Amino acid sequence: MRYVPSVDVFKKNCMTLKVGDHIDVYDLQRFLVQAGYMHTTRVDQPFNFSKRGGVVDIFSMQYDHPIRIDFFDDEIDYIKFFDEKTQRTIEKVDEIEIIPATDLLYLDQEVGSVVTQIKDSFEEQYQKMDDLFKDDFEEKIMIDIENLKAHATDSSQYAYYHLFKNVTSIKDYLDDPILSLIHI
């Protein structure tokens, strides 16, 4: 079975931003990385974001065009949609919703428990393994653990997703209005 984040975890990885809101730009960047967005120098495709000075560009999948958020210190001065090719403004808006760019979502407080489970399983398998394979196996596990801690969205992370407490199957979304955000 393919696991997905619980409805609660999905909602915690959504963010509404309004003109006049106060938010630290670095907190916004951390949120975007945790929600699966890739930091790039220029936003020209979905699931990317960039930051230049007091401007953050985000391309969220629920919109046809990327979003530009201009900050004055920690206050959102304006929000607009722009053309990713020409960089010209399409429309100014007062509010936007950012939804996750991945279904590999988990809470920071769960990572320690999952890392412990991985290490316990690793030790058990490591003892039974032929010496020829031990170094490569250990290196792979350590890389996977670092990727989990960094909220990397590498597909290899799905191997550990079942270890998180706040995961479920897609059926739990069927009676929830959050589906209105997802275009199937």
Language-model features and meaning:
Residues M1-I182:
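ASCE RecA-like P-loop NTPase motor cores
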